[in-house]
Amino acid sequence: METMRAQRLQPGVGVGGRGTLRALRPGVTGAPTSAATPPVGPPPAPPPPAPPLPPLLLAGAPGLPLPPGAAGSPAVLREAVEAVVRSFAKHTQGYGRVNVVEALQEFWQMKQSRGADLKNGALVVYEMVPSNSPPYVCYVTLPGGSCFGSFQFCPTKAEARRSAAKIALMNSVFNEHPSRRITDEFIEKSVSEALASFNGNREEADNPNTGIGAFRFMLESNKGKSMLEFQELMTVFQLLHWNGSLKAMRERQCSRQEVLAHYSHRALDDDIRHQMALDWVSREQSVPGALSRELASTERELDEARLAGKELRFHKEKKDILMLAAGQLGNMHSSSC
């Protein structure tokens, strides 16, 4: 019974015969899938555009810790970031400049030393986008999984790294403010705003089988956590929604509560990414060009969010999954030649 339940909750979209364990296994087809074997039967169509999600379910949503108006103007954003960075003046080098890369790392090491639950340690990870000429772009991933990127025109790789560290440091600092914690008051305010936005009623908020009810359930399950911690969790659900996996789970008769309970305790890992990539391989084989169109759209969204100083993990994970799918397609084409 437990095995069947786990199979139904796998993130693969899955098509093919129903009522068997094989049909409920991860992947994009009812038959076993390998990199060199075309899928059997009609693959799933690309998911429709995602409808608006409740507040705090969007990457870079208002609940994330950016100063008021910071995302509205590049100049205001730069000023806000510099103000936070200057507060770390003890981390100076040369002519009074702040070593933001060092400051960001030290900030998270300090959090760990004070008892923060950092499952993968306090290491801050930087990733440069391959390029032979400016502007250079750098992403930084914080220990919890939140991702930020260089938000300015960066003529050097070192400047891109510093730019990414600045925006990550600002968000890390603001995230420590008490107003960034999920409290009973915050939950009531957020649910009321969601009800108003979607013309819902109070009964919906109390029913975990509705969208707003599920939103409330997620907030209450994460009471006491910060906005960044909550956003890291919601990235998994955003990806499941984007990929069409949530719809597939409903078709497998998974209740909303089952899905929430299962994925609230599952980190985003290579297994989830691989299964979603297989879904996009199947879509591309069914609708040639679907993958390249989605990738182009995702890259635009990622760049816009990066330049606005927003949290980027949802957009970046989408791009990584699509690039993984493109690589798998390339391997399949090479092996068939």
Swiss-Prot record:
The gene is Lix1l. This is LIX1-like protein. Residues 39-55 have a biased composition (Pro residues). Belongs to the LIX1 family. Signal peptide: none annotated. Residues 1-55 are annotated as: Disordered. Residues 26-38 have a biased composition (Low complexity). One of its GO terms (biological process) is mitral valve development. It comes from Mus musculus (Mouse).
